[in-house]
UniProtKB/Swiss-Prot annotation:
The keyword Hydrolase applies. It is an enzyme of class 3 (hydrolase). Its EC number is 3.5.1.47. This is N-acetyldiaminopimelate deacetylase. One of its GO terms (molecular function) is N-acetyldiaminopimelate deacetylase activity. It comes from Listeria innocua serovar 6a (strain ATCC BAA-680 / CLIP 11262). The lineage of its organism: Bacteria, Bacillati, Bacillota, Bacilli, Bacillales.
Amino acid sequence: MLNEFIAIRRDLHQIPETGYKELKTQAYLLDYISKLPNEFLEIKKWRTGILVLVKGTNPGKTIGYRTDIDALPITEETGLPFESKHAGNMHACGHDLHMSIALGVLTHFASKPAKDNLLFVFQPAEEGPGGAKPIMESAEFSEWRPDTIYGLHIAPEYKVGQIAIKPGLLFANTSELFISFKGKGGHAAYPHLANDMVVAASAFVGQMQTIISRNIDPMDSAVITIGRIHGGEIQNVIAETAFLDGTIRTLSPETMEIVWTRLKQLAKGWEEAYQCEVEFHPGSDYYQVDNDPVETEEFIHFLEEQYPESYVPARSAMTGEDFGYFLSEIKGFMFWLGVDSEYSLHHAKLSPKEEAIPFAIDVLVNFLESK
């Protein structure tokens, strides 16, 4: 018989929705939660997200657990019998597993409440435009604001049954990068009468990498990646405009500031050199995931005692997660959950091993009961 929460994961996998459009997802979650024993539950909606408070038997504090619920604009290529029914969208970052795990933990405590209050945060828009900071600033969250908060993220590179975590920095600071170039278009045969923005943007892509190699301490780390470039409309017309979309990743806010300062200085030089206008457009910024050392060491000790084969020391990663906003104000941690997939996060063929779901539920239930 299929595990109940694996079945839930498969249901959610079929209805992926992007940030703040998670209407079917929210409805599915609310329908499930409404059928749980409600003696100890209070439920609030926030935009397309949900907050659920499980009242403790003798509460002295509130412990938070956060899961993200949104998907990515990726066309699925897994060929699974339960693949996405929403063309162009896919749960390619494992948020379907995250939700099913959270529901499993919530189901346990709805019937057997812990001593302290538990707050379950089903957060929208992690992939963008960013839901953590707005939900933290909401009246709904503020009323039930937890004293500690935890979260997880699936990790294709680890085996099922493995949990990777470390004190301190786990995920990087991230900043979305959107740049437009505006020059002067013209006939392809007369480049001297135009200002070619394909040339300007292409040169900028290469030059910005010198920020990493020549402005960042070699013992530090930073990444600038351009994932999309678009310029012009037809092959025989010099492009009047060009656009670069990318991301910046750093291990500290200070390094992020250096990168942005140099990018803007570089852009001023480009305007002079290529006789164009260079403009930066706002995107999402994610704060680093910085695990509280005391909370993390407590969890590591718990794993070593209860799941001695599971703990794996993690390394800091350049991935980004807006859970960092929670940890910037509330002590807690995030960990990697092994799902053993040959394809990476954000890949159209990502296919996590579902056995990780009941394992994670068991670990989290036992850990929260030990608090």
